[in-house]
Every structure is written in structure tokens, then in C-alpha cells.
A protein has these predicted regions:
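Intrinsically disordered, low-complexity segments enriched in small/flexible residues
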Residues: 49-131, 135, 139-157, 161
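Extended, hydrophobic alpha-helical segments in both membrane/secreted and soluble proteins
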Residues: 1-5, 12, 146-160, 165-169
Length: 169
């Protein structure tokens, strides 16, 4: 699948309690197998939401990026980026704020936020056109790319390529 959207109370596992017990791994309750918090942290869940209504809204937003450009959009305020990126390149800043400063208002959808903290990835619209946004996170390992961040970036690049979305990095 392209994306996995889950609620915080959901579980994702390869087998249930009987399979785990049959494999000699102990006795577990169904809710102990593959909790969303664990799966989000290891990169399995792309978008984690509070409830099913938010999941439906997230799915609709996600699918909207593959419908092409829209004529009705609101660009972010021109001053939105003015204070986000510091003049001193050695200072840490929040790349998610920079993404918000270039994306059309209300169109930013971050992916895999619990995994690969060295890279921030998101789908958005700029001038009504759907795009992928990707940025190194200078607050994590000084912006260095570790294995989780590389995995996250590679998967995001595949997603953008598969759907013909331009990448802004």
C-alpha cells in the first residue's frame, strides 16, 4: 500500500494471540500485539490519528493530492518564512515551520512523523499544485541522515515518483 493510516488505539500484527502463544513466545492479549504507538515509532504507520473520523479526513486529504492541481487555493502569507530560517546557518530551526511557510494554507500533510526523525516528509500544495516536501531536520543529529531517515526518504521518493509529484527539498 502507499500509506497506512491508523488510530492511536489500533493494533497491527502479523498474527493473533493464538499464533504468538503457539510459537512459544508467551501469552498475550490482542491489544498487546502490534500497538499503534510501537508501529508508528518503527515506521509502519504513516499517519496516526485520534479516531476514525480523523482517519477518514486524513485519507481524503491524502487522495486529494493525486487528483491534480486545484484552482482555488490560499497561498501562505509572504512573511511566513521571514523568521523561520536563521541567518546563521549553524543555528537549529524547525523545518516543519518552513514547510508550512511555503505550502498553501491547510494543505500540509506530514508522513511518518514518528519515524526517521532526521528527515521531515509531507505532501502539500504550492500554488494549487500537489508536491512532495522533504527536508533534513537540523534538530536531529545536526541534520545528518541516519538509517531510519534514509529509509523514510527513499520510501517518500518512491511515493512521489509513483504518482508523478514534483519534489521540493
Amino acid at each position: 500500500s502507499d500509506v497506512i493510516i491508523a488510530t492511536r488505539t489500533s493494533n497491527i500484527g502479523m498474527g493473533g494471540p493464538a499464533m504468538v502463544e503457539g510459537g512459544g513466545l508467551g501469552v498475550f492479549k490482542p491489544e498487546q500485539i502490534g500497538p499503534a504507538a510501537v508501529q508508528h515509532g518503527n515506521g509502519v504507520i504513516d499517519i496516526l490519528v485520534d479516531d476514525e473520523a480523523q482517519a477518514v479526513a486524513a485519507a481524503r486529504q491524502y487522495l486529494s493530492y493525486f487528483q491534480g492541481p486545484v484552482a482555488d487555493f490560499t497561498a501562505p502569507p509572504a512573511a511566513a518564512l521571514r523568521d523561520v530560517v536563521p541567518e546563521n546557518r549553524l543555528r537549529v530551526y524547525d523545518t516543519r515551520q518552513a514547510m508550512e511557510g511555503i505550502a498553501d494554507v491547510g494543505t500540509l500533510q506530514h508522513l511518518r512523523t514518528g519515524f526517521g526523525q532526521g528527515i521531515h516528509t509531507a505532501l502539500a500544495r504550492i500554488g494549487g499544485r500537489p508536491v512532495g516536501l522533504m527536508a533534513n531536520n537540523p534538530a536531529h543529529l545536526g541534520g545528518a541522515i541516519d538509517t531510519d531517515a534514509a529509509d523514510k526518504a527513499a520510501r517518500f521518493l518512491q511515493l512521489c515518483n509513483a504518482h508523478g509529484l514534483p519534489l521540493v527539498s
